[in-house]
């Protein structure tokens, strides 16, 4: 569903999400944000459900910086919207992704296309990070420790 910042439906069918307050909090805190996508992506949910920040290890997600898991707040509540508002206020960079503890993911960006692309990249990174952590725990070696990327970090 596509809505404007006054909550008018622009395109699509159905009603406005119960999570509208969370979406609006992001828009209100950063004028560069023109798209907010909330999802329950399978691999990303592993990190969100466990309350873990996601290691940002794939080249395709470097421009998102830290992938932080926010403290728990029940879905659809003003408390969750305020946690999102606080994080967006503290870090104005876009694109940006947040894990919502025990709930899902939130990706903010400049356009629908770029934000959806970042959601797909986030999910790919989640799969890679999950497998990396499993391999590391099993003592499977052969890959260097994570190295900071110094390229492909901006739009």
Residue ranges, per PLM feature:
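Glycine-rich flexible loops
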Residues: 1-155
């Amino acid at each position: 569903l596509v809505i404007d910042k006054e909550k008018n439906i622009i395109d699509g069918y159905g009603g406005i999400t119960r999570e509208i307050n969370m979406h609006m909090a992001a828009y209100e805190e950063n004028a560069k944000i023109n798209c907010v996508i909330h999802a329950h992506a399978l691999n990303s949910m592993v990190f969100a459900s466990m309350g873990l920040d996601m290691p940002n290890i794939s080249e395709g997600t470097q421009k998102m910086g830290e992938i932080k898991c926010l403290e728990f707040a029940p879905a659809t509540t003003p408390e969750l919207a305020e946690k999102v508002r606080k994080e967006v206020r503290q870090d104005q960079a876009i694109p940006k992704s947040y894990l919502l503890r025990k709930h899902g993911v939130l990706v903010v960006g400049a356009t629908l296309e770029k934000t959806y692309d970042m959601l797909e990249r986030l999910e790919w990174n989640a799969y890679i990070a999950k497998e990396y952590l499993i391999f590391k725990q099993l003592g499977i070696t052969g890959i260097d420790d994570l190295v900071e990327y110094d390229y492909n970090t901006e739009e």
